[in-house]
Amino acid sequence: MTTITATTPAARHAAPATIPEVSNHIGVAKTVANSFTMAYRGLLKLKHNPEQLFDVTVQPILFTALFAYLFGGAISHSVHDYLPLLIPGIMVQTVVLTSVVTGTQLREDMDKGVFDRFKSLPIARISALSGALLADVVRYTLATVLTVVVGLILGYRPEGGFAGVVVAGLVIIFCSFAVSWIWALVGVTGKSAAGVQGISMMIMFPLTFMSGAFVPVSTMPGWLQGINHANPIYYMVNAARELMNNNAYTSNLVWSLVGSVAVIAVFAPLALRAYMRRA
């Protein structure tokens, strides 16, 4: 027996089912939320790999004690007199060198294909990059606090008071965040993590040591003092010293902030554009 199903005219002329379109646009609020989620991912990486905190925990303690007891007597005739010169310099040196890790870890993640997996997720593509930089701010804060604590243990008493120390710490963290955009660009465009680290250290070590972070700039040759006026780390060190020791707001602070804003304005778009081409 054959069953015949009648087809009504309405069914024959029914419009085909449409598949709803999904927008690829992600708003600013969602991008910010995704960035903080990726920053949290970066903090979880630190939790599961605590050895990555070596540079912001052991280094401030080791360098502060080492420089204080090795050079204190030679430069300032006593460790106590050397600490007002040393502690702000160590803070800048530790945090700025920590910013190099940003580029190195970005390159490692890209080599492992981590960002390739992010492409399949409904998140803002730039959130992986911005989240990594936000997570590093926690590292900068930890290094800053530890350096101050070690200095206090050694006998350093900042004449600028609590306010001067806090403002100096915030300035150093902000400036280092700005510098991290440079290393983010190097990390995204570099060919290997080792190469990124080598380039970064080759640039940062001379700039840090010639900035007067550990010795008075007045003892340097005239030509080196002249070069220092084009060294951004020099202004960071002087601004930190003036804030921590006198709570003074001078042109060094202005140049540090203006320079940091300029670095972000130039290198953040370049890093984002390079990342978007490769992510």
Please report, for each region that a protein language model flagged, where it lies by residue.
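Hydrophobic alpha-helical transmembrane segments of multi-pass membrane transport proteins
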Residues: L62-F67, L83-L154, F174-C175, V179, ...
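Membrane-interfacial helix-loop-helix junctions in multi-pass membrane proteins
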Residues: K45, S76-H77, R157, T208-A265
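Alpha-helical transmembrane segments and their short interhelical loops
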Residues: R125-S200, A248-L272
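Aromatic- and glycine-rich beta-strand/loop motifs that create alpha-glucan
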Residues: A17-Q59
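Transmembrane helix segments
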Residues: Y69-G73, A184-A230
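Junction motif at the cytosolic side of a transmembrane helix
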Residues: T2-A15, I19, M244-A248, W255-A279
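Transmembrane helix-loop junction
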Residues: A68-G73, E108, R117, L121, ...
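Short alpha-helical transmembrane interface motifs in multi-pass membrane proteins
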Residues: V22-H25, H48-Q52, V95-V100, G131, ...
